[in-house]
UniProtKB/Swiss-Prot annotation:
Listed name of the protein: Autophagy-related protein 9
UniProt feature, compositional bias: Acidic residues: 38-47
Keyword tags: Autophagy, Cytoplasmic vesicle, Endoplasmic reticulum, Golgi apparatus, Lipid transport, Membrane, Phosphoprotein, Transmembrane, Transmembrane helix, Transport
Family: Belongs to the ATG9 family.
Quaternary state and interactors: Homotrimer; forms a homotrimer with a central pore that forms a path between the two membrane leaflets. Interacts with ctl1.
Source organism per UniProt: Schizosaccharomyces pombe (strain 972 / ATCC 24843)
PANTHER family in UniProt: APG9 AUTOPHAGY 9, AUTOPHAGY-RELATED PROTEIN 9
Reactions the enzyme catalyzes: a 1,2-diacyl-sn-glycero-3-phosphocholine(in) = a 1,2-diacyl-sn-glycero-3-phosphocholine(out); a 1,2-diacyl-sn-glycero-3-phospho-L-serine(in) = a 1,2-diacyl-sn-glycero-3-phospho-L-serine(out); a 1,2-diacyl-sn-glycero-3-phosphoethanolamine(in) = a 1,2-diacyl-sn-glycero-3-phosphoethanolamine(out); a 1,2-diacyl-sn-glycero-3-phospho-(1D-myo-inositol-3-phosphate)(in) = a 1,2-diacyl-sn-glycero-3-phospho-(1D-myo-inositol-3-phosphate)(out)
Length: 702
């Protein structure tokens, strides 16, 4: 919960303590020391957390951590006494530490009692302007929390607040970070801002997204309702065929559809506009707390962001070490492993549901597994919005075996309701998707017909390949690196009879095209006036033959291609990390290639399935998903584990130390592929260790 200035002023008025506004802490010198520590390259190992064998380093070269000497910033962030081995007390009056200066008193209990009784007695506040206030012994003996930002009263538990406009931008950012209570949501916002490449990129992306939707709606409405198409030929001009007051002449159904689209567009505008303050606060967090400039956002690595974030852990009361503000039992863990688990808490469950076959996504009649973006959205709404609460935590009812029947019935009803909603809006969404994809890809396929043969992974393949605790940008890098190897593997199984056929077709069409080009060179007017068939000129056939030749040549493999399917498949597996058991002894077979092609399909086929998925998803919601509701409830209960400092997470995403292999490549490139490649949790652990451990060989991250 972030700070609210208006509420702050009201607190001061109620307490009749306006003089307290003058006691704003002067933290400039301390913050300058902290900034020097953050920007320094000599002490980059002090805030790093080593948990489960994972060590984070800021730089891409992953220099090994070197213990640093104590420096003045430990006063604020280390939470450990420099001159004494005695641990500080959680309660300020329970122990006394020798000090050169008298310890300030903090009569917080009296202040809270005055608030409850309505007394106008001024609460006694610490004198932040005292030059000896920040003495380490005084500070540590006077208050259990050594950070000045967590010494500021926390939200609704406060009895007096520092005047907001007296704080600098950097102080306000650290104040917000010190008062973060929903750590899952905040870390997800930090990661989303990172993948969005900064405030300007996110706003521009959203702006053009809205403009694209507006253009599709407006242009489609104009060409379908505002043009008199039968009058196009006689008039020969746009002004002569444009209808006046075309909106008023629309049919009721068209009018309703238009208003639905406009309502959606308005809601999108409102959401994006109201989200700008949150994005601005995240921008300030990156600039003032993480010390990452906006200009560096497109190129900064996640390791650097993570390193800077870990240096702030002692500023937040929930993540500070040694339980100085909260007990060790309630302390939130903050390291690379915990951050990945918090960001991917729901995604880890989704990966497990798909890879373990808990959700049946096979169409009843077609006997084909289908997973489109529409199906993903419905699964998230029906299952994850039901399983997790507003704080992003697993509901306690799903851990109770006695609630199994009730939860499965509620989940079944959610599937049925979602099915009716999909039936209601599916035709409208399908029409929009067809028009949008037509506008988007027509020019590409028209100018480059060979693009029809390009392949992309299906959504089902992507969720099958993704590993536990693998952040989205790491996964995108891995998959993007695999496309060249995957296309090379698919071309290892040519149909030589079809190749000869397309070579012949390409030769015939090329001959006709050559003659037509030569004719038009001598008389350019023949390109438009000369008709080869009725109403079809030379220009038409030049475009047609050129497109067919491009498609034919894209099917014909390169003459220098070396056929080694087993070697090519091993190369693909190093990126996809996917190999069913029966592939091991059949890498050369056509059956393996066909199964792989079902995951690595033509892009145009994927687009068609996305459109059909809008219409077929209600079938899954009505007939397939309800029968899985009890298995889904059982899965969340049986495969949920409580990790201290992280909360309840998917058991498959819980890693142990020291994996047996240093990298996934070592599993695949050996003479006999290790059966460990089929164990996704173990493979995920190896990949995670490879990404974040200093000693493991790893590829350079872009």
């Amino acid at each position: 919960m972030f700070y609210q200035p208006a509420q702050n002023k009201k607190q001061y008025d109620d307490l009749a303590d306006i003089e307290a506004q003058n006691n704003v802490p002067n933290t400039q010198e301390v913050l300058e020391a902290w900034q020097e520590s953050l920007d320094s390259d000599e002490d980059e190992s002090s805030p790093l957390e080593e948990s489960n064998g994972f060590t984070i380093s800021e730089h891409d070269d992953f220099v090994k951590s070197v213990p640093r000497k104590n420096n003045p910033t430990d006063l604020l962030y280390s939470g450990k006494l420099l001159d004494s081995d005695e641990p500080p007390s959680v309660h300020g009056n329970s122990s006394k530490v020798p000090s050169k200066h008298p310890s300030p008193s903090f009569p917080e209990t009296t202040s809270l009692r005055n608030l409850q009784n309505g007394s106008k007695q001024k609460p006694a506040l610490p004198n932040f302007n005292d030059p000896h206030f920040y003495n380490e012994d005084v500070t540590r003996s006077g208050h259990p929390n050594r950070s000045i930002y967590t010494q500021l009263p926390r939200n609704e538990f406060s009895n007096a607040r520092v005047l907001w406009n007296r704080l600098s931008a950097r102080d306000r950012v650290l104040w917000r970070w010190a008062n973060v209570e929903n750590l899952d949501s905040f870390l997800q916002q930090v990661y989303t801002y990172y993948t969005g490449k900064g405030l300007s990129c996110i706003i521009v992306h959203r702006l053009f997204q809205i403009l694209t939707v507006s253009f599709v709606i407006g242009f489609t409405t104009f060409i379908t309702s505002c043009i008199d198409w039968p009058a196009v030929t006689p008039h020969g001009s746009l002004a002569g065929v444009t209808k006046s007051q075309c909106i008023a002449q629309m049919s009721p159904i068209t009018y309703l559809v238009l208003w639905l689209f406009l309502s959606f567009l308005l809601a999108l505008w409102i959401y994006y506009l109201t989200d700008i303050p949150r994005l601005w606060q995240m921008r300030e967090f990156y600039i003032h707390a993480l010390k990452i400039a906006t200009a560096d956002m497109p190129t900064v690595s996640w390791q650097r962001v993570l390193y800077r974030l870990l240096k702030l852990k002692n500023v937040n009361a929930l993540t500070a070490e040694d339980g100085r503000v909260v007990s060790l039992h309630n302390m939130k863990r903050l390291d690379a492993y915990a951050i990945a688990n918090r960001i991917m808490r729901k995604d880890n469950y989704f990966i497990a549901l798909i890879n373990n076959g808990i959700i049946n996504i096979e169409l009843p009649l077609l006997h084909r597994r289908i997973l489109t973006h529409t199906t993903e959205w419905n699964i998230n709404w029906c299952i994850f919005n039901f399983v997790f609460d507003e704080q992003g935590q697993l509901r306690s009812a799903f851990r109770n075996p006695n609630s199994r029947k009730r939860l499965s019935e509620e989940l079944r009803r959610r599937f049925i309701v979602a099915g009716f909603l999909n039936c209601l809006f599916a035709p409208i969404v399908a029409i929009y998707l067809v028009i949008h994809n037509f506008f988007r890809y027509f020019n590409e396929y028209h100018k480059n017909p060979g693009a029809l043969s390009t392949r992309r992974y299906t959504p089902l393949a992507l969720w099958t390949f993704r590993e536990y605790n693998e952040l989205q940008h790491f996964f995108d890098e891995r998959i993007n690196d695999s496309y060249a190897a995957a296309s090379h593997y698919v071309s290892q199984f040519p149909d030589f009879n079809m190749i000869r056929l397309f070579k012949y077709i390409s030769f015939i069409l090329g001959s006709f095209t050559a003659i037509l080009v030569i004719i038009t060179v001598f008389d350019p007017e023949l390109m438009v006036t000369f008709e080869i068939t009725k109403d079809r000129s030379v220009l038409f056939y030049l475009g047609l033959f050129g497109s067919l030749i491009a498609v034919s040549r894209s099917i014909i493999p390169d003459e220098t291609l070396v056929f080694a399917p087993e070697k090519a498949l091993r190369r693909v597996i190093t990126f996809t990390h996917y190999m069913p058991g029966w592939w091991s002894d059949n890498m050369h077979s056509k059956a393996v290639q066909q199964e792989f092609c079902s995951l690595y399909s033509y892009r145009i086929v994927n687009l068609l399935w996305e459109i059909l998925g809008i219409l077929l998803t209600p079938v899954l919601l009505f007939f397939t998903f309800p029968s899985c509701s009890q298995d889904i409830v059982d899965f969340f209960r049986e495969h949920t584990i409580n990790v201290e400092g992280v909360g309840y997470v998917c058991s498959y995403a819980v890693f142990q130390d020291n994996p047996p292999y240093e990298s996934v490549a070592s599993l695949v490139q050996s003479r006999k592929i290790s059966p460990l490649i089929q164990n996704k949790p173990e493979l995920s652990r190896i990949s995670f260790y490879e990404q974040f451990n200093t000693e493991a060989p790893r590829r350079d991250l872009r």
